[in-house]
Each structure stands twice: as structure tokens, then as C-alpha cells.
Amino acid sequence: MENDKPFIVVLVGPTAVGKTEFSIELAKKYNGEIISGDSMQVYKNMDIGTAKITLDEMSGIPHQMIDILEPDEPFSAYEFKNRAQKLIKEITHRGRVPIIVGGTGLYIQSLIYDYAFEDETISEAHSESVETQLAELDQLSNDELHQYLASFDEISAQDIHPNNRKRVRRAIQYYLKTKKLLSSRKKVQQFTENYDTLLLGIEMSRDILYQRINTRVDIMLERGLLSEVKQLVENGYETSQSMQAIGYKEIVPVINGQISLDEATNKLKQHSRNYAKRQMTWFKNKLDVLWLDREKMSLSLMLDEVSVQIQKRRT
């Protein structure tokens, strides 16, 4: 292993592929602590819809970046990177191996590589002007604000749902600040690794994965997803950005009497399958992953392959 960079293990893969189970085995074998790389598991009281690991499933392995925010608090790749970097230092200092587990690709990418966004620094006067314009736009409805965005950045408008007011506003703010379109913005990324990273991924055939996703949704509903979402709505979180996540946005209309549970269930399964497909495409296009086939390999064989890869780094 490289001596000048901390060693970390990163485990990626689509939703429902079995990352949680394998991560526990990895942590047991390599004296690891797990950092969640999931954009939703940071939120308290959003357990069932995020398939959050339970205390029993943790098997005594320390887990970080879970239940750290209220549902109405913002969270971003930038915030994740800052917190994860500190945790990696702490875990390494304890003589343990940081194991980052997640399906949010941008979070993983931002942590592994030097990754930053274009500078948006502007003068104080310009900043005040932008804020004044935004304050006026804040009077618009979601649909009106979305239409305003579409008037100059149609691509971003197509990519962002009208109800995702935060992202719509952000795209407008970026344009007002820079006179550039958010859709044409290029992220500045230097492919310099911040860590000595063993990047693993779990995969399986699409048919089997989709079956697992459908089953997982059924289990979520049996475990009380409807009650969880109802409680969040009653607590005033219905319009929070976190409630736009898959697993929640499909159930809110049921709570409000707009659609049936059967219709919501079908939507949730479809959205989850679509998300899994996007995840796999992203991981395979953006990251250099050592893929482990869960259908062809037992957990034991997967662990053996990890041992081989670690041994190679030591020689």
C-alpha cells in the first residue's frame, strides 16, 4: 500500500444489490469502520424508505454518517466530502480501516478525487443585486419559477422537477451570478486520488436485481413505510427536499388521498428500478471499479478476492 496516503475501501453498487451485508463482513475481517456514502441515510426518522441499516444488522461495527441531520436540513456532496475526510482521519488514527459504502456516485467521486466546482466569487454589489432579484422571484409559485428558469436554460429546466424548488432556485442563482447556464457548467476535476483506494462494486444480472428491488419495496411497506411517511408529513416535512427522494415522494400522495397505495407501490418499484439502472451506468462510466458478481460468488469468495487485491498492493 502507498505509505503517503491513507488506505480506504470503497464499496459501491446499485440499490438492493447487497452492499450492507458484504460491508459488515469486510469490516469484521479488516478491522473496519463504515462511513455511509448514501445521500439519504444522513436523515433521522427516515429509516424504512432509505433501507437504513438496523442496529442488529450493524453487528457491533461502528457506522458513521447515519442519522446526523433533521429531514429539513440540506446536505450536499461538498458537505459529505468535508465530513468524510475528517472521519477517515479519525478512523485511520484509531488504527482501523475506513470503509465507505454507498450508492450516491457523486459523493463517492468527490471523496476519492480532487473535485471542485467552478469559482462563483462575485463582488459585494453584484451579490446584493442577485439577492434582490432572487427575493422578487421567491414570490413566484413553483411552476412559475420553473417557467422562468426554462426561459433561459431549457436543459436545466428539463432536468429539474418544478417541485424541486431548491434546485430550480439554485440554477437561477448560478445564472444571475455568472451569466452562464448551469446546464453548461463543467465540474473541475483532477483525477488525482486523495487516498490509497480499493474501489469495489457488487453487481448482478438486471433481472435478479429488479426482483430484489420489488421484494424490498414490499418489505418496506410491510415494515410500516406508510406510517413513517405519514409521521414525517405530520411533523411538517412534506415540502422538505429530503421528501423528494424515492421511497417518500411516491407515498406522500397516498397520505393526501390523491392516489391509491397500489398505484404508489407500482410507481415506487418502477422508480427504484430506474434508479438502479442509472446507478450502474454512472459507476461503470465514471469510476474504475473492481466488480464482484454476487450471483457467481459467495460472500466468502468475494472476501477472498478482496484479500488478493490487498496483497497485490503490499507487494
From Swiss-Prot:
Keywords: ATP-binding, Magnesium, Nucleotide-binding, Transferase, tRNA processing. The keyword Hydrolase does not apply. Residues 38-41 are annotated as: Interaction with substrate tRNA. Its EC number is 2.5.1.75. The record marks 104 as: Interaction with substrate tRNA. It comes from the Bacteria. It catalyses: adenosine(37) in tRNA + dimethylallyl diphosphate = N(6)-dimethylallyladenosine(37) in tRNA + diphosphate. GO terms for biological process: tRNA modification. SUPFAM superfamilies: P-loop containing nucleoside triphosphate hydrolases. ATP binds at residues 13-20. Its cofactor is Mg(2+). InterPro entries: Dimethylallyltransferase, IPT, P-loop_NTPase. GO terms for molecular function: ATP binding; tRNA dimethylallyltransferase activity. Substrate binds at residues 15-20. Belongs to the IPP transferase family. Catalyzes the transfer of a dimethylallyl group onto the adenine at position 37 in tRNAs that read codons beginning with uridine, leading to the formation of N6-(dimethylallyl)adenosine (i(6)A). Monomer. This is tRNA dimethylallyltransferase. It comes from Staphylococcus saprophyticus subsp. saprophyticus (strain ATCC 15305 / DSM 20229 / NCIMB 8711 / NCTC 7292 / S-41). The gene is miaA.
